[in-house]
Amino acid sequence: IDYRGPISSKARSEFLRNARALLAPTVFTEPFCGMAVEAMLCGTPVVAVDYGAMTETVTEGVMGYRCHTLQDWIDGINAVGDLDRRVIAGIARAKWSLEACGKRYDKIFCQLNDLYRSGWYELRDTGLTA
């Protein structure tokens, strides 16, 4: 393990692509965990805690490993070399690339537009709630 501290955003992609894995032993319940997503977009497996956003972003045994115990961490770190980095990057790009996220946002905005076509006050006047 080599901790280098903060790095510039320009150097981050190259650094993550060349990393064996990203370790995310956070004690914070991450609501999204951008660091894990960034690593996986580069094809780098993630070894992380098994709560918060990690349960949704790190597919166990495919994109990395989620850990409960010290032994889980040891096993996960030792097993990352068995994961296919191209598969990790492909799945991550399908889920979190700008294009993929943009399509989901577009769908949500279109749904909101349809729902509130007559304005925000329409629901209030009909007694409906959002």
Located regions from the model:
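C-terminal "capping" alpha-helix adjacent to the active site of nucleotide-linked donor transferases
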Residues: 65-86
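Short acidic/histidine- and often glycine-rich active-site loop of Leloir-type glycosyltransferases
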Residues: 50-61, 65-66
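A charged, aromatic-enriched C-terminal amphipathic alpha-helix characteristic of glycosyltransferases
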Residues: 82-129
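Nucleotide-activated donor-binding/catalytic signature segment of Leloir-type glycosyltransferases, i.e.
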Residues: 1-10
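Short hydrophobic beta-strand element within catalytic cores of glycosyltransferases
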Residues: 45-48
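Short glycine/acidic-rich beta->alpha loop that forms part of the nucleotide-sugar donor binding site
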Residues: 30-33, 40, 50
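Acidic donor-binding loop of glycosyltransferase active sites
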Residues: 17-31
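Short alpha-helical segment that forms part of, or immediately flanks, the ligand-binding pocket
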Residues: 13, 36-41, 55-56
